[in-house]
Protein backbone atom coordinates (compact mmCIF):
# COMPACT_ATOMS: atom_id res chain seq x y z
CA UNK A 1 0.00 0.00 0.00
CA UNK A 2 1.37 3.41 -0.97
CA UNK A 3 1.02 6.41 1.25
CA UNK A 4 0.83 10.10 0.41
CA UNK A 5 4.09 11.73 -0.46
CA UNK A 6 5.79 8.47 -1.42
CA UNK A 7 7.32 8.25 -4.87
CA UNK A 8 6.95 5.19 -7.02
CA UNK A 9 8.03 3.94 -10.41
CA UNK A 10 5.74 5.21 -13.22
CA UNK A 11 2.79 2.97 -13.62
CA UNK A 12 -0.58 4.29 -14.89
CA UNK A 13 -3.66 3.08 -16.61
CA UNK A 14 -4.35 4.52 -20.10
CA UNK A 15 -1.44 6.90 -19.57
CA UNK A 16 -0.72 9.43 -22.31
CA UNK A 17 2.64 11.17 -22.65
CA UNK A 18 4.67 12.88 -25.32
CA UNK A 19 7.79 11.03 -26.49
CA UNK A 20 10.31 13.56 -27.82
CA UNK A 21 12.34 10.82 -29.49
CA UNK A 22 9.54 10.16 -31.98
CA UNK A 23 7.76 13.53 -31.96
CA UNK A 24 4.29 12.08 -31.50
CA UNK A 25 1.78 11.47 -28.82
CA UNK A 26 1.96 7.97 -27.44
CA UNK A 27 -0.79 6.21 -25.51
CA UNK A 28 0.35 3.34 -23.36
CA UNK A 29 -2.25 0.83 -22.28
CA UNK A 30 -1.51 -0.67 -18.90
CA UNK A 31 -3.43 -2.82 -16.52
CA UNK A 32 -5.42 -0.69 -14.14
CA UNK A 33 -3.80 -0.30 -10.76
CA UNK A 34 -5.17 1.20 -7.60
CA UNK A 35 -2.67 4.07 -7.45
CA UNK A 36 -4.01 7.50 -6.64
CA UNK A 37 -3.47 10.33 -9.05
CA UNK A 38 -1.11 12.16 -6.74
CA UNK A 39 1.08 9.10 -6.49
CA UNK A 40 0.97 8.53 -10.23
CA UNK A 41 2.09 12.05 -11.03
CA UNK A 42 4.77 12.03 -8.37
CA UNK A 43 6.01 8.72 -9.70
CA UNK A 44 6.24 10.08 -13.26
CA UNK A 45 8.11 13.06 -11.99
CA UNK A 46 10.50 10.79 -10.05
CA UNK A 47 11.11 8.72 -13.16
CA UNK A 48 11.75 11.84 -15.23
CA UNK A 49 14.13 13.38 -12.71
CA UNK A 50 16.00 10.16 -12.00
CA UNK A 51 16.47 8.72 -15.48
CA UNK A 52 16.33 11.91 -17.55
CA UNK A 53 14.84 10.08 -20.51
CA UNK A 54 12.47 12.88 -21.51
CA UNK A 55 14.36 16.14 -21.23
CA UNK A 56 11.35 18.25 -22.25
CA UNK A 57 9.25 17.21 -19.31
CA UNK A 58 9.41 19.56 -16.33
CA UNK A 59 11.80 18.52 -13.59
CA UNK A 60 10.67 19.81 -10.25
CA UNK A 61 9.76 18.34 -6.90
CA UNK A 62 6.15 17.86 -5.85
CA UNK A 63 4.56 20.62 -3.83
CA UNK A 64 2.52 20.20 -0.72
CA UNK A 65 -0.41 22.50 0.08
CA UNK A 66 -3.09 22.73 2.72
CA UNK A 67 -6.31 22.14 0.74
CA UNK A 68 -6.62 25.64 -0.68
CA UNK A 69 -7.80 26.12 -4.27
CA UNK A 70 -5.09 26.38 -6.88
CA UNK A 71 -5.62 28.32 -10.11
CA UNK A 72 -3.94 26.75 -13.12
CA UNK A 73 -2.80 28.80 -16.09
CA UNK A 74 -4.95 28.97 -19.19
CA UNK A 75 -3.60 25.91 -20.98
CA UNK A 76 -5.32 22.91 -22.51
CA UNK A 77 -6.01 20.18 -20.02
CA UNK A 78 -6.97 16.57 -19.85
CA UNK A 79 -10.20 16.34 -17.92
CA UNK A 80 -9.69 12.74 -16.89
CA UNK A 81 -7.14 10.06 -17.46
CA UNK A 82 -9.55 8.21 -19.80
CA UNK A 83 -10.17 11.02 -22.27
CA UNK A 84 -7.59 13.17 -23.99
CA UNK A 85 -7.86 16.60 -25.54
CA UNK A 86 -5.07 18.90 -26.67
CA UNK A 87 -1.84 17.63 -25.14
CA UNK A 88 1.29 19.71 -24.77
CA UNK A 89 3.83 17.18 -23.70
CA UNK A 90 2.67 16.38 -20.18
CA UNK A 91 -0.33 15.37 -18.17
CA UNK A 92 -2.36 18.27 -16.80
CA UNK A 93 -5.33 17.52 -14.58
CA UNK A 94 -8.43 19.67 -15.01
CA UNK A 95 -8.31 20.43 -11.33
CA UNK A 96 -5.82 19.79 -8.65
CA UNK A 97 -5.33 16.11 -8.08
CA UNK A 98 -5.00 15.47 -4.43
CA UNK A 99 -5.11 12.71 -1.91
CA UNK A 100 -6.37 14.06 1.36
CA UNK A 101 -4.76 12.67 4.43
CA UNK A 102 -4.57 14.82 7.50
CA UNK A 103 -5.31 17.87 5.35
CA UNK A 104 -2.15 17.35 3.26
CA UNK A 105 -2.30 17.40 -0.54
CA UNK A 106 0.32 16.50 -3.13
CA UNK A 107 -0.11 18.65 -6.23
CA UNK A 108 1.91 18.44 -9.44
CA UNK A 109 2.41 21.91 -10.96
CA UNK A 110 4.07 21.63 -14.36
CA UNK A 111 5.17 24.39 -16.69
CA UNK A 112 3.90 24.09 -20.27
CA UNK A 113 6.49 23.63 -23.01
CA UNK A 114 6.46 25.32 -26.40
CA UNK A 115 5.96 23.56 -29.68
CA UNK A 116 9.53 24.33 -30.74
CA UNK A 117 10.82 22.54 -27.68
CA UNK A 118 8.56 19.59 -28.32
CA UNK A 119 9.66 19.18 -31.91
CA UNK A 120 13.40 19.57 -31.28
CA UNK A 121 15.48 16.42 -31.29
CA UNK A 122 18.01 15.85 -28.49
CA UNK A 123 21.64 15.64 -29.59
CA UNK A 124 23.00 12.13 -29.94
CA UNK A 125 25.02 10.84 -27.04
CA UNK A 126 28.71 10.64 -27.99
CA UNK A 127 30.32 7.25 -27.85
CA UNK A 128 32.99 7.00 -25.15
CA UNK A 129 35.64 4.36 -25.58
CA UNK A 130 36.52 2.59 -22.33
CA UNK A 131 39.93 3.35 -20.87
CA UNK A 132 42.23 0.36 -21.29
CA UNK A 133 43.34 -1.24 -18.04
CA UNK A 134 47.11 -1.50 -17.70
CA UNK A 135 48.52 -4.94 -17.08
CA UNK A 136 49.80 -3.92 -13.65
CA UNK A 137 46.65 -2.14 -12.60
CA UNK A 138 46.61 -4.01 -9.31
CA UNK A 139 50.06 -2.69 -8.44
CA UNK A 140 49.22 0.83 -9.54
CA UNK A 141 46.16 0.88 -7.32
CA UNK A 142 48.16 -0.34 -4.32
CA UNK A 143 48.95 2.49 -1.92
CA UNK A 144 50.12 2.92 1.63
CA UNK A 145 46.47 3.04 2.71
CA UNK A 146 46.05 -0.66 1.93
CA UNK A 147 46.64 -3.42 4.42
CA UNK A 148 50.15 -4.63 5.14
CA UNK A 149 49.27 -8.05 3.80
CA UNK A 150 48.10 -6.69 0.45
CA UNK A 151 51.13 -4.41 0.06
CA UNK A 152 53.50 -7.25 0.93
CA UNK A 153 51.81 -9.54 -1.58
CA UNK A 154 52.19 -6.98 -4.37
CA UNK A 155 55.84 -6.30 -3.57
CA UNK A 156 56.62 -10.01 -3.51
CA UNK A 157 55.49 -10.26 -7.12
CA UNK A 158 58.51 -8.19 -8.17
CA UNK A 159 61.27 -10.21 -6.52
CA UNK A 160 64.13 -11.17 -8.81
CA UNK A 161 64.73 -14.62 -7.38
CA UNK A 162 67.94 -15.98 -5.95
CA UNK A 163 66.72 -15.96 -2.36
CA UNK A 164 64.56 -18.33 -0.38
CA UNK A 165 60.91 -17.42 -0.86
CA UNK A 166 60.17 -17.68 2.86
CA UNK A 167 63.04 -15.32 3.64
CA UNK A 168 61.87 -12.86 0.97
CA UNK A 169 58.33 -12.91 2.33
CA UNK A 170 59.44 -12.25 5.89
CA UNK A 171 61.89 -9.55 4.83
CA UNK A 172 59.20 -7.69 2.86
CA UNK A 173 56.58 -8.06 5.58
CA UNK A 174 59.03 -6.75 8.16
CA UNK A 175 59.85 -3.76 5.95
CA UNK A 176 56.20 -2.90 5.27
CA UNK A 177 55.38 -2.97 8.98
CA UNK A 178 58.28 -0.61 9.70
CA UNK A 179 57.08 1.81 7.03
CA UNK A 180 53.35 1.64 7.82
CA UNK A 181 53.50 4.84 9.87
CA UNK A 182 55.54 6.60 7.14
CA UNK A 183 53.02 6.57 4.32
CA UNK A 184 54.95 8.89 2.02
CA UNK A 185 58.01 6.65 2.12
CA UNK A 186 55.89 3.51 1.78
CA UNK A 187 54.22 4.98 -1.30
CA UNK A 188 57.68 5.81 -2.65
CA UNK A 189 58.76 2.19 -2.18
CA UNK A 190 55.64 0.85 -3.90
CA UNK A 191 56.11 3.24 -6.82
CA UNK A 192 59.81 2.47 -7.17
CA UNK A 193 59.33 -1.30 -7.15
CA UNK A 194 56.22 -1.50 -9.32
CA UNK A 195 57.59 0.93 -11.91
CA UNK A 196 61.03 -0.71 -11.94
CA UNK A 197 62.59 2.64 -11.08
CA UNK A 198 61.13 4.46 -14.09
CA UNK A 199 59.41 6.98 -11.83
CA UNK A 200 61.64 9.09 -9.54
CA UNK A 201 61.02 8.46 -5.86
CA UNK A 202 62.35 9.77 -2.58
CA UNK A 203 64.32 8.02 0.11
CA UNK A 204 62.83 5.03 1.93
CA UNK A 205 64.51 4.91 5.32
CA UNK A 206 64.45 2.55 8.25
CA UNK A 207 66.13 2.96 11.60
CA UNK A 208 69.70 1.76 11.69
CA UNK A 209 70.09 -1.13 14.11
CA UNK A 210 72.71 -1.21 16.80
CA UNK A 211 75.06 -3.40 14.77
CA UNK A 212 73.97 -1.89 11.45
CA UNK A 213 72.46 -5.13 10.18
CA UNK A 214 69.03 -6.51 9.47
CA UNK A 215 68.04 -9.83 11.00
CA UNK A 216 65.28 -11.79 9.28
CA UNK A 217 64.50 -15.49 9.72
CA UNK A 218 67.75 -16.11 11.57
CA UNK A 219 69.91 -14.46 8.91
CA UNK A 220 71.71 -11.14 9.05
CA UNK A 221 72.68 -8.73 6.32
CA UNK A 222 73.14 -5.07 5.50
CA UNK A 223 69.59 -3.68 4.94
CA UNK A 224 70.08 -1.95 1.57
CA UNK A 225 71.96 -4.99 0.25
CA UNK A 226 69.16 -7.34 1.34
CA UNK A 227 66.46 -5.42 -0.53
CA UNK A 228 68.67 -4.73 -3.53
CA UNK A 229 69.03 -8.49 -3.87
CA UNK A 230 65.30 -9.03 -3.58
CA UNK A 231 64.20 -6.46 -6.17
CA UNK A 232 67.18 -5.83 -8.45
CA UNK A 233 70.36 -7.94 -8.34
CA UNK A 234 70.15 -11.35 -6.63
CA UNK A 235 73.94 -11.78 -6.41
CA UNK A 236 75.05 -8.24 -5.60
CA UNK A 237 77.53 -7.63 -2.78
CA UNK A 238 77.90 -4.62 -0.52
CA UNK A 239 81.07 -3.34 -2.21
CA UNK A 240 79.31 -3.30 -5.58
CA UNK A 241 76.57 -0.88 -4.50
CA UNK A 242 77.16 2.83 -4.94
CA UNK A 243 74.68 5.45 -3.74
CA UNK A 244 73.21 7.71 -6.41
CA UNK A 245 73.20 11.48 -6.18
CA UNK A 246 69.43 11.70 -5.75
CA UNK A 247 69.61 9.82 -2.44
CA UNK A 248 69.38 12.38 0.34
CA UNK A 249 70.33 9.99 3.16
CA UNK A 250 74.07 9.91 3.71
CA UNK A 251 75.83 6.57 4.09
CA UNK A 252 77.13 7.49 7.53
CA UNK A 253 73.84 8.78 8.89
CA UNK A 254 73.75 7.71 12.55
CA UNK A 255 70.02 6.97 12.75
CA UNK A 256 68.62 6.01 9.34
CA UNK A 257 69.61 4.04 6.27
CA UNK A 258 67.97 4.29 2.85
CA UNK A 259 66.83 0.94 1.45
CA UNK A 260 65.28 2.23 -1.78
CA UNK A 261 66.78 -0.24 -4.30
CA UNK A 262 66.67 2.37 -7.04
CA UNK A 263 68.81 4.82 -5.08
CA UNK A 264 71.83 2.60 -5.73
CA UNK A 265 73.71 1.47 -8.79
CA UNK A 266 75.85 -1.58 -9.25
CA UNK A 267 79.50 -1.20 -10.16
CA UNK A 268 82.01 -3.85 -11.11
CA UNK A 269 84.33 -4.58 -8.21
CA UNK A 270 87.27 -6.96 -7.98
CA UNK A 271 87.74 -6.37 -4.29
CA UNK A 272 87.27 -9.17 -1.79
CA UNK A 273 84.21 -8.38 0.25
CA UNK A 274 84.14 -8.20 4.00
CA UNK A 275 81.92 -10.07 6.40
CA UNK A 276 78.97 -8.07 5.09
CA UNK A 277 79.14 -9.75 1.68
CA UNK A 278 76.73 -12.59 2.37
CA UNK A 279 73.72 -13.14 4.53
CA UNK A 280 75.13 -16.57 5.38
CA UNK A 281 77.97 -16.97 7.85
CA UNK A 282 80.62 -19.07 6.19
CA UNK A 283 83.47 -20.45 8.27
CA UNK A 284 86.06 -21.03 5.56
CA UNK A 285 89.76 -21.45 6.40
CA UNK A 286 91.76 -18.29 6.09
CA UNK A 287 94.16 -18.26 3.20
CA UNK A 288 97.86 -18.15 3.94
CA UNK A 289 98.30 -15.17 1.66
CA UNK A 290 96.19 -13.12 4.04
CA UNK A 291 97.65 -14.48 7.26
CA UNK A 292 101.30 -14.61 6.19
CA UNK A 293 103.76 -16.87 7.96
CA UNK A 294 102.16 -16.05 11.30
CA UNK A 295 98.70 -17.04 10.15
CA UNK A 296 97.48 -19.55 12.72
CA UNK A 297 99.76 -19.46 15.71
CA UNK A 298 100.55 -22.84 17.24
CA UNK A 299 98.79 -23.28 20.54
CA UNK A 300 102.03 -24.37 22.18
CA UNK A 301 103.83 -21.15 21.34
CA UNK A 302 103.72 -18.14 23.57
CA UNK A 303 104.65 -15.12 21.48
CA UNK A 304 106.20 -15.18 18.03
CA UNK A 305 109.93 -14.62 18.50
CA UNK A 306 110.37 -13.22 15.01
CA UNK A 307 108.00 -11.24 12.88
CA UNK A 308 106.49 -12.78 9.75
CA UNK A 309 108.17 -12.84 6.38
CA UNK A 310 111.70 -13.63 7.53
CA UNK A 311 112.59 -14.74 4.02
CA UNK A 312 112.82 -11.19 2.81
CA UNK A 313 114.99 -10.76 -0.24
CA UNK A 314 116.59 -7.38 -0.53
CA UNK A 315 116.84 -7.54 -4.31
CA UNK A 316 114.13 -6.18 -6.60
CA UNK A 317 113.83 -6.66 -10.32
CA UNK A 318 114.16 -3.35 -12.17
CA UNK A 319 110.73 -3.69 -13.74
CA UNK A 320 108.98 -4.98 -10.65
CA UNK A 321 105.77 -3.03 -10.06
CA UNK A 322 105.13 -1.25 -6.83
CA UNK A 323 103.56 -3.50 -4.22
CA UNK A 324 100.50 -1.95 -2.70
CA UNK A 325 99.06 -3.48 0.43
CA UNK A 326 95.28 -3.81 0.17
CA UNK A 327 93.00 -1.82 2.40
CA UNK A 328 92.37 -3.56 5.70
CA UNK A 329 88.59 -3.42 5.58
CA UNK A 330 88.61 -5.07 2.14
CA UNK A 331 90.44 -8.21 3.33
CA UNK A 332 88.20 -10.78 5.00
CA UNK A 333 89.12 -12.17 8.37
CA UNK A 334 87.76 -15.44 9.68
CA UNK A 335 88.07 -14.71 13.37
CA UNK A 336 87.44 -18.35 14.23
CA UNK A 337 90.74 -19.28 12.56
CA UNK A 338 92.83 -16.81 14.56
CA UNK A 339 94.55 -17.87 17.75
CA UNK A 340 95.64 -15.15 20.12
CA UNK A 341 98.77 -16.07 22.09
CA UNK A 342 98.45 -16.27 25.83
CA UNK A 343 99.81 -13.29 27.76
CA UNK A 344 103.21 -13.67 29.40
CA UNK A 345 101.73 -12.46 32.70
CA UNK A 346 98.32 -11.73 34.13
CA UNK A 347 97.19 -8.13 34.26
CA UNK A 348 96.12 -6.35 37.42
CA UNK A 349 93.58 -4.15 35.60
CA UNK A 350 91.72 -5.02 32.43
CA UNK A 351 90.89 -1.38 31.57
CA UNK A 352 91.28 2.22 32.68
CA UNK A 353 88.73 5.00 32.16
CA UNK A 354 89.23 8.74 31.79
CA UNK A 355 86.27 11.13 31.91
CA UNK A 356 86.31 14.20 29.62
CA UNK A 357 84.24 17.34 29.23
CA UNK A 358 85.02 18.66 25.78
CA UNK A 359 88.81 18.16 25.49
CA UNK A 360 89.54 18.48 29.22
CA UNK A 361 90.04 15.38 31.40
CA UNK A 362 88.12 15.57 34.69
CA UNK A 363 89.19 13.70 37.80
CA UNK A 364 91.67 10.85 38.07
CA UNK A 365 92.04 7.81 35.88
CA UNK A 366 89.64 5.08 36.99
CA UNK A 367 91.18 1.59 36.88
CA UNK A 368 89.10 -1.58 36.88
CA UNK A 369 90.59 -4.60 38.63
CA UNK A 370 90.79 -7.77 36.58
CA UNK A 371 90.53 -9.98 39.67
CA UNK A 372 87.68 -8.27 41.52
CA UNK A 373 85.48 -6.77 38.83
CA UNK A 374 84.78 -8.38 35.48
CA UNK A 375 82.44 -5.53 34.65
CA UNK A 376 82.31 -1.81 35.29
CA UNK A 377 79.37 0.60 35.46
CA UNK A 378 79.73 4.24 34.43
CA UNK A 379 76.67 6.25 35.49
CA UNK A 380 75.59 9.66 36.72
CA UNK A 381 75.51 8.71 40.41
CA UNK A 382 76.98 10.67 43.32
CA UNK A 383 78.76 7.92 45.30
CA UNK A 384 82.42 8.96 45.67
CA UNK A 385 83.36 5.43 46.79
CA UNK A 386 81.69 3.60 43.96
CA UNK A 387 85.05 2.29 42.74
CA UNK A 388 84.92 -0.30 45.51
CA UNK A 389 81.94 -1.82 43.71
CA UNK A 390 83.33 -1.44 40.20
CA UNK A 391 81.32 1.71 39.58
CA UNK A 392 82.42 5.10 38.26
CA UNK A 393 79.99 7.82 39.39
CA UNK A 394 80.36 10.82 37.11
CA UNK A 395 77.98 12.90 39.22
CA UNK A 396 80.58 13.07 41.98
CA UNK A 397 83.20 14.66 39.70
CA UNK A 398 83.32 18.45 39.93
CA UNK A 399 84.56 20.97 37.38
CA UNK A 400 84.71 24.70 38.11
CA UNK A 401 84.84 25.45 34.38
CA UNK A 402 81.91 23.22 33.44
CA UNK A 403 79.87 24.55 30.53
CA UNK A 404 76.10 24.70 30.31
CA UNK A 405 76.11 22.07 27.55
CA UNK A 406 78.02 19.65 29.79
CA UNK A 407 75.66 20.33 32.68
CA UNK A 408 72.60 19.54 30.56
CA UNK A 409 74.15 16.41 29.07
CA UNK A 410 75.12 15.04 32.50
CA UNK A 411 71.48 15.19 33.58
CA UNK A 412 70.58 12.54 30.98
CA UNK A 413 73.33 10.04 31.84
CA UNK A 414 71.16 8.30 34.44
CA UNK A 415 72.15 4.65 34.85
CA UNK A 416 74.77 5.07 32.15
CA UNK A 417 76.51 2.08 30.57
CA UNK A 418 77.90 -1.25 31.67
CA UNK A 419 81.11 -2.68 30.16
CA UNK A 420 81.85 -6.39 30.57
CA UNK A 421 85.18 -8.14 29.99
CA UNK A 422 84.76 -11.74 28.85
CA UNK A 423 87.20 -14.58 29.39
CA UNK A 424 88.06 -14.74 25.67
CA UNK A 425 89.19 -11.10 25.72
CA UNK A 426 86.13 -9.59 24.06
CA UNK A 427 84.32 -6.54 25.46
CA UNK A 428 80.55 -6.07 25.39
CA UNK A 429 78.42 -3.10 26.32
CA UNK A 430 74.92 -2.66 27.72
CA UNK A 431 73.41 0.80 27.35
CA UNK A 432 70.91 2.31 29.75
CA UNK A 433 70.99 5.74 28.10
CA UNK A 434 71.57 7.22 24.67
CA UNK A 435 75.25 6.92 23.76
CA UNK A 436 77.54 7.16 20.72
CA UNK A 437 80.55 4.84 20.52
CA UNK A 438 83.86 5.08 18.69
CA UNK A 439 85.04 1.53 18.13
CA UNK A 440 87.44 0.16 15.54
CA UNK A 441 85.73 -3.22 15.68
CA UNK A 442 82.34 -1.67 14.92
CA UNK A 443 83.94 0.26 12.06
CA UNK A 444 85.28 -3.04 10.72
CA UNK A 445 81.91 -4.80 10.93
CA UNK A 446 80.24 -1.85 9.17
CA UNK A 447 82.90 -1.67 6.48
CA UNK A 448 83.73 1.96 7.22
CA UNK A 449 87.01 3.78 7.74
CA UNK A 450 88.42 3.51 11.22
CA UNK A 451 87.37 6.27 13.64
CA UNK A 452 85.26 7.88 10.93
CA UNK A 453 81.84 7.64 12.55
CA UNK A 454 79.95 7.38 15.80
CA UNK A 455 77.89 4.25 16.37
CA UNK A 456 74.60 5.01 18.06
CA UNK A 457 73.23 2.89 20.91
CA UNK A 458 69.83 3.36 22.50
CA UNK A 459 68.72 2.05 25.91
CA UNK A 460 68.54 -1.71 25.56
CA UNK A 461 68.74 -4.70 27.86
CA UNK A 462 70.80 -6.68 25.35
CA UNK A 463 74.58 -6.48 25.24
CA UNK A 464 76.59 -5.91 22.07
CA UNK A 465 80.20 -6.68 21.32
CA UNK A 466 82.25 -3.52 20.79
CA UNK A 467 85.70 -5.15 20.83
CA UNK A 468 87.07 -8.51 19.62
CA UNK A 469 90.57 -9.49 20.72
CA UNK A 470 91.13 -11.78 17.70
CA UNK A 471 90.31 -8.96 15.30
CA UNK A 472 92.60 -6.53 17.15
CA UNK A 473 95.49 -9.00 17.16
CA UNK A 474 95.20 -9.73 13.45
CA UNK A 475 94.98 -6.08 12.48
CA UNK A 476 97.93 -5.07 14.62
CA UNK A 477 99.91 -7.95 13.15
CA UNK A 478 99.16 -6.74 9.64
CA UNK A 479 100.09 -3.15 10.31
CA UNK A 480 103.25 -4.19 12.06
CA UNK A 481 104.12 -6.42 9.13
CA UNK A 482 103.50 -3.58 6.69
CA UNK A 483 105.75 -1.26 8.66
CA UNK A 484 108.54 -3.85 8.79
CA UNK A 485 108.34 -4.46 5.05
CA UNK A 486 108.63 -0.76 4.37
CA UNK A 487 111.67 -0.47 6.63
CA UNK A 488 113.42 -3.38 4.93
CA UNK A 489 112.61 -2.05 1.48
CA UNK A 490 113.92 1.35 2.44
CA UNK A 491 117.15 -0.20 3.67
CA UNK A 492 117.48 -2.14 0.42
CA UNK A 493 116.99 1.02 -1.60
CA UNK A 494 119.65 2.85 0.41
CA UNK A 495 122.06 -0.05 -0.13
CA UNK A 496 121.46 0.16 -3.86
CA UNK A 497 119.57 -3.10 -4.28
CA UNK A 498 116.40 -1.46 -5.55
CA UNK A 499 115.22 1.99 -6.59
CA UNK A 500 112.95 3.95 -4.26
CA UNK A 501 110.21 4.00 -6.91
CA UNK A 502 109.55 0.28 -6.51
CA UNK A 503 109.53 0.31 -2.73
CA UNK A 504 106.37 -1.35 -1.34
CA UNK A 505 103.78 1.06 -0.05
CA UNK A 506 103.44 1.15 3.69
CA UNK A 507 100.01 0.43 5.07
CA UNK A 508 98.38 3.68 6.20
CA UNK A 509 97.92 4.42 9.89
CA UNK A 510 100.68 2.05 10.98
CA UNK A 511 101.93 4.44 13.65
CA UNK A 512 101.88 3.38 17.28
CA UNK A 513 99.52 6.14 18.39
CA UNK A 514 97.02 5.36 15.65
CA UNK A 515 97.19 1.62 16.34
CA UNK A 516 96.61 2.30 20.02
CA UNK A 517 93.52 4.39 19.27
CA UNK A 518 92.05 2.01 16.68
CA UNK A 519 92.72 -1.31 18.42
CA UNK A 520 93.18 -0.60 22.12
CA UNK A 521 90.61 2.05 23.07
CA UNK A 522 86.86 2.62 23.05
CA UNK A 523 85.36 6.10 23.35
CA UNK A 524 81.78 6.70 24.50
CA UNK A 525 79.94 10.02 24.27
CA UNK A 526 76.83 10.53 26.36
CA UNK A 527 73.74 12.01 24.68
CA UNK A 528 75.57 13.97 21.94
CA UNK A 529 77.03 12.63 18.70
CA UNK A 530 79.79 13.84 16.42
CA UNK A 531 80.80 13.41 12.82
CA UNK A 532 80.46 14.94 9.37
CA UNK A 533 76.68 15.34 9.67
CA UNK A 534 76.91 17.19 12.99
CA UNK A 535 78.28 20.52 14.12
CA UNK A 536 80.68 18.62 16.39
CA UNK A 537 83.25 17.07 14.07
CA UNK A 538 85.27 15.15 16.68
CA UNK A 539 84.46 13.50 19.97
CA UNK A 540 86.52 16.15 21.76
CA UNK A 541 83.78 18.64 20.94
CA UNK A 542 81.07 16.66 22.76
CA UNK A 543 80.02 17.91 26.23
CA UNK A 544 80.84 14.74 28.20
CA UNK A 545 82.48 11.48 27.18
CA UNK A 546 84.80 8.75 28.41
CA UNK A 547 87.78 6.98 26.89
CA UNK A 548 88.24 3.32 27.84
CA UNK A 549 91.78 1.98 27.36
CA UNK A 550 91.90 -1.83 27.15
CA UNK A 551 95.05 -3.25 28.72
CA UNK A 552 95.03 -6.66 27.08
CA UNK A 553 95.38 -5.41 23.47
CA UNK A 554 97.94 -2.89 24.73
CA UNK A 555 99.95 -5.82 26.00
CA UNK A 556 99.74 -7.49 22.59
CA UNK A 557 100.79 -4.31 20.82
CA UNK A 558 103.74 -3.89 23.14
CA UNK A 559 104.96 -7.41 22.45
CA UNK A 560 104.63 -6.97 18.69
CA UNK A 561 106.64 -3.76 18.83
CA UNK A 562 109.34 -5.47 20.89
CA UNK A 563 109.62 -8.27 18.35
CA UNK A 564 109.85 -5.75 15.55
CA UNK A 565 112.62 -3.87 17.36
CA UNK A 566 114.55 -7.08 17.96
CA UNK A 567 114.29 -7.97 14.30
CA UNK A 568 115.32 -4.50 13.19
CA UNK A 569 118.44 -4.53 15.36
CA UNK A 570 119.56 -8.02 14.32
Swiss-Prot record:
Role summary: Involved in TGF-beta pathway.
Disulfide bridge map: none
Protein name, as recorded: Dwarfin sma-4
GO terms classed as biological process: anatomical structure morphogenesis; BMP signaling pathway; cell differentiation; dauer larval development; determination of adult lifespan; nematode larval development; nematode male tail tip morphogenesis; parturition
Xref: SUPFAM superfamilies: SMAD MH1 domain, SMAD/FHA domain
InterPro entries recorded: Dwarfin, MAD_homology1_Dwarfin-type, MAD_homology_MH1, SMAD-like_dom_sf, SMAD_dom_Dwarfin-type, SMAD_FHA_dom_sf, SMAD_MH1_sf
CDD domains according to UniProt: MH1_SMAD_4
Main location: cytoplasm
Domain named MH2: residues: 350-570
Alphabetical list of SMART domains matching this protein: DWA, DWB
Keyword annotations: Cytoplasm, DNA-binding, Metal-binding, Nucleus, Transcription, Transcription regulation, Zinc
Family to which the UniProt record says this protein belongs: Belongs to the dwarfin/SMAD family.
A molecular-function term among this protein's GO annotations: RNA polymerase II cis-regulatory region sequence-specific DNA binding
Keyword NADP among record annotations: no
Biased composition (Pro residues): 121-134
A cellular component annotation (GO) from this entry: heteromeric SMAD protein complex
Region of interest called Disordered, as start-end residue ranges on this chain: 115-134
Domain MH1, residue spans: 150-273
Top-level lineage group: Eukaryota
Amino acid sequence: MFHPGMTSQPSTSNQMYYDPLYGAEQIVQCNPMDYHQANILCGMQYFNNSHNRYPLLPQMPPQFTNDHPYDFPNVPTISTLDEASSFNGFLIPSQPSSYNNNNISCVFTPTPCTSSQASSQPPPTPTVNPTPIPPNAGAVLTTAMDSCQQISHVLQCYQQGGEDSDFVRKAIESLVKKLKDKRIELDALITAVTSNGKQPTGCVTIQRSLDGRLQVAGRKGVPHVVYARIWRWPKVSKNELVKLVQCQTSSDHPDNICINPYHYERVVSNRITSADQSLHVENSPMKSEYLGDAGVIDSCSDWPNTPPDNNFNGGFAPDQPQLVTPIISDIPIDLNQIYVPTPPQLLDNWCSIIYYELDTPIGETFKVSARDHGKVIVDGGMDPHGENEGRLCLGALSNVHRTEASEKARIHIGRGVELTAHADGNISITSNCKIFVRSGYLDYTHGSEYSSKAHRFTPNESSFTVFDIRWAYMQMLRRSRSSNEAVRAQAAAVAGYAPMSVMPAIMPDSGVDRMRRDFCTIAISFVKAWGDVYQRKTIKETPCWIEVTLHRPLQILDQLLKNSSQFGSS
